[in-house]
Swiss-Prot record:
InterPro entries per record: NolW-like (IPR005644), NolW-like_sf (IPR038591)
Transmembrane domains' residue ranges: 17-36
UniProt-recorded name of the protein: Nodulation protein NolW
GN (gene name): nolW
Taxonomy, superkingdom: Bacteria
Cited Pfam families: Secretin_N
Gene3D superfamilies assigned to the protein according to its UniProt record, in alphabetical order: 3.30.1370.120, 3.55.50.30
Intracellular or extracellular location(s): Membrane
Reported function: Regulates cultivar-specific nodulation of soybean.
Membrane topology: Single-pass membrane protein
Keywords: Membrane, Nodulation, Plasmid, Transmembrane, Transmembrane helix
GO cellular component, one term: membrane
Organism: Rhizobium fredii
Keyword field contains Lyase: no
Amino acid sequence: MPTTPIPFTPLHMFRRLLCVGLFLFAGIHTTLGATLPLPSTSYKYTVLDQDLSAALQEFGNNLKISVNISAEVKGRIRGRIPELSPREFLDRLTDLYDLQWYYDGVVLYVSAAKEAQTRMLVLSSVHFSAFKLALDKLDISDERYPVRPAPGNGLVLVSGPPRFIALIEQTLNGLLAVAQAQPRATDTPARESVMVLFRGSSTTVVRGGRPEVFYTSEMLPENDDGGKAELSKK
């Protein structure tokens, strides 16, 4: 029977993103993608005529791995399968029956290749480098399913099995939520500076760093008493 998917709650995603920040701060490097814990010894499996889903489920049971098998995985295994390592056995079945598999660190998801999805994601305020790094640190990245940025880093094209796409979208939503929760600095308009420069009999008014008015002693405007007005620094 298919295993029920384990969803990421917002709190779970926030905690994992917080761990990403700690990894970045500490400069710790991790391996890309969650590692499927399979032994290197040969996997002995004898089958003459068995349902494909049942064989995959038994594969997980024998190796103590939770397996989620899509209802679209159909077919029967007929004939002898050579003795292979567990990873080679899994890859052989996916090649023969046009399947895809993805391991999220908890559950091995097996789906039909026709279920693969393609998404164009809008990064908004999140930079692609930060998005890709979060995928790497959360062990979501998988070299079989690349994440490709569009020119300008505003869009990302992703393709892969449903579980992989779901984690990609959840990660982006988590990063956007963290970015929106951060306080934004308010822009304070700069005060315009006004200076009056005196050089001999000439006077220059400088406003905002630009000379604006030039006076000589003969050009100063008269005050109400008929005398020359005086300029002062503001």
